[in-house]
UniProtKB/Swiss-Prot annotation:
Function: Involved in unsaturated fatty acids biosynthesis. Catalyzes the dehydration of short chain beta-hydroxyacyl-ACPs and long chain saturated and unsaturated beta-hydroxyacyl-ACPs.
Catalytic site: H48
Reaction(s) catalysed by this chain's protein: a (3R)-hydroxyacyl-[ACP] = a (2E)-enoyl-[ACP] + H2O
Alphabetical list of InterPro entries matching this protein: FabA_FabZ (IPR013114), FabZ (IPR010084), HotDog_dom_sf (IPR029069)
The family this protein is said to belong to: Belongs to the thioester dehydratase family. FabZ subfamily.
Protein name stated in the entry: 3-hydroxyacyl-[acyl-carrier-protein] dehydratase FabZ
EC number(s) per entry: 4.2.1.59
Primary site of residence: cytoplasm
GO molecular function: (3R)-hydroxyacyl-[acyl-carrier-protein] dehydratase activity
Gene: fabZ
NCBIfam families to which the protein is assigned, alphabetical: fabZ, PRK00006.1
Length: 146
């Protein structure tokens, strides 16, 4: 549904911190499904870990938050160019169930739980080949920048 050029309109992140490659489904105000292709060419694997490359869990959480940001921006019909940004406000119930390694395509599925006074709450999961990798409840704050 959204390719990387469209995603860049809704997220202020750029290389090397843009974690979403494509959005495959988005229902405004409800849910988003996006993915990231994990490549051995990513710089993070030079240090995490050179002889046993594992994609860091904190970056999986960041990717979930970025998917939530795209959903929030699309739902509110805003972009960062409008002077708005979604900031990571909190996380609850994080669980890591499986390692993510080069060659994996990680799907992020996030659903809106609530949106009140600019604070959005999402239930999120990450999966590889249909297998649960990570789950978390993420909160983002819609704020004016500048």
């Amino acid at each position: 549904m959204l390719d990387i050029l469209e995603i860049r309109k809704y997220l202020p992140h750029r290389y090397p911190f843009l974690m979403i490659d494509r959005v495959v489904e988005l229902i405004e105000g409800e849910s988003i499904t996006a993915y990231k292709n994990v490549s051995i060419n990513e710089e993070i694997f030079q240090g995490h870990f050179p002889h046993f490359p594992v994609f860091p869990g904190v970056l999986l959480i960041e990717a979930m938050a970025q998917a939530c940001g795209v959903l929030g921006f699309k739902t509110a019909n805003k972009t960062p160019e409008d002077g708005s940004i979604y900031l990571f406000a909190g996380i609850d119930g994080v669980r890591f169930k499986r390692q993510v390694v080069p060659g994996d395509r990680v799907y992020f599925e996030c659903k809106v739980v609530s949106a009140k006074r600019g604070i959005w709450k999402f239930d999120c999961v990450a999966k590889v080949d249909g297998e649960l990798v990570t789950s978390a409840t993420i909160m983002c704050a819609d704020r004016v920048v500048g």
